[in-house]
Structure formats: C-alpha cells, structure tokens
Amino acid sequence: MKEFSYVIQDPEGIHARPAGEFVKAAKSFESSVKIAKDGKQVDAKRIFGVMGLAAKQGHEVTITVEGPDEDKAAAELEAFLKANL
C-alpha cells in the first residue's frame, strides 16, 4: 500500500475539469485508489465521490493506492496533483 498527502493549491479547489481528469487517471490503474479529506474516504475512480469531497484551496487530501501497480499509480497520481491542482 502506498499513501501520500497533498495540499490543494488551485484557487478553485477540485472542480469539474481536473476532477474528471484525475478520475480518468485513477481508472487507468488496476490498483484500488482512494482519496480522503477530513476523515471521509471515497473511491477516486468515481467522479461523484471525488467532487463530493468539496476540497478547496488549502485543504489536504490523502491518496491511498493498493494493488499490483501501486508504485506507478502513486507516483503518477501525485505528479498529476502537483501539475493540475
């Protein structure tokens, strides 16, 4: 299992476009991908769950990846967040 945290930098927070791209990226991996904020954890492969977190600028999210490609998934998803959010 791999886990990392990220503080949202985008002034708009996790909004529709980057949320959709993040979900698409998460779906490209076989591993289970979860995203959590303030103790609420959701499936990162489901757009409504990701949007439902209502993560705004300055909020910390925690990503947990578990499965056969977890190393690659964690690295690529962390890079995605840094580049887009």
Predicted stretch roles:
Residues 1, 36-39, 83:
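Generic cytosolic/nucleocytoplasmic N-terminal low-complexity/intrinsically disordered segments
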Residues 1-5, 60-62:
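Intrinsic-disorder/low-complexity, polar/charged segments enriched in Ser/Thr/Lys/Arg/Asp/Glu/Gln
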Residues 8-43, 48, 52-56:
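Compact, glycine-rich, soluble single-domain proteins
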Residues 51-85:
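C-terminal structural segments of small proteins and small subunits
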